[in-house]
Amino acid sequence: MAEHKRKTVFVQGAVSAQFVADSIAKHSSKTDIGAHSIFLGQVRRDEKDGKFVQAIDYTAHEEMANEQFHRIREDAFEKYPLTCMHIHHSLGAVAAGEISLFVFTSSPHRRAAIDACNEIVERIKNEVPVWGKEVLEDGEYVWKTN
């Protein structure tokens, strides 16, 4: 199978709702698609020792992360009959309530779109060198674990 074009995954700050909506809208003309599956990772306002998380500040080893994102994409295209796939992950500060991860898969049939999306999200969380520092309301921070 031919390798797919390498895609830019990282965005500075939150993934906007408008970006997600525009991504969905662009696929309405692709009539060979029968199903989409979307995962949106949102920053929670968790409580840590009596203080609330205000944001997560994401950092990454970008070169390694981009290589791993590409490998995950290639593996998913090889395993599932996907028409399209998009992955976008935040770098920098993302406030509680905002989106930090957007995974969007499309296929002629729902099972492939759903299974691929789920597998991609799990692999990102387990394999990609991205770290989140939870910034608390008093300015202190806690390193997040997946």
Q: Residue spans of the language-model regions?
A:
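Short hydrophobic/aromatic beta-strand micro-patches
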Residues: 104-106
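N-terminal, polar/charged subdomain of small-to-medium soluble alpha/beta proteins
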Residues: 1-99, 108, 112-118, 122-146
